[in-house]
């Protein structure tokens, strides 16, 4: 399923010129292999994963601890990134903590272009059955915070958030562009439900 997900995203990037595809360890690896195979480009591993940390960087409740875990968890290899144009794949953006930190580290290595591909649509609605953290704030979700800022209100309704779900809609495109600039990335795309 992850290979097929990556391959589907690669079909939307037919004209994108890159040097290779890479997965954000470990959740993006399968997607990136599928992407690389479909696009017929090399798959490389430009990150070394330091495993004696939390299993998921978004799990600690304290933001300072999340930042520390994200900073320590993945280390880029400059020999594989300097001057390169790379598609990175991951499964999702939850809080955005780890992704933002990794992008800063990649820019510090002299990477030429970072094209981020996420294997699920933006997480706009929380799921109470997923026990990622004890927090119940919907604003822990990166996409939800972006929508809140775009709408300029503190109390988002589901009806308002639904305006951002359609990947062909203007609100969705504007949200993704704000995310792209904020992170900062060369390009940012999310998997579409109609490709699943």
Name each model-derived stretch:
Residues 1-196:
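PRPP-associated nucleotide enzymes
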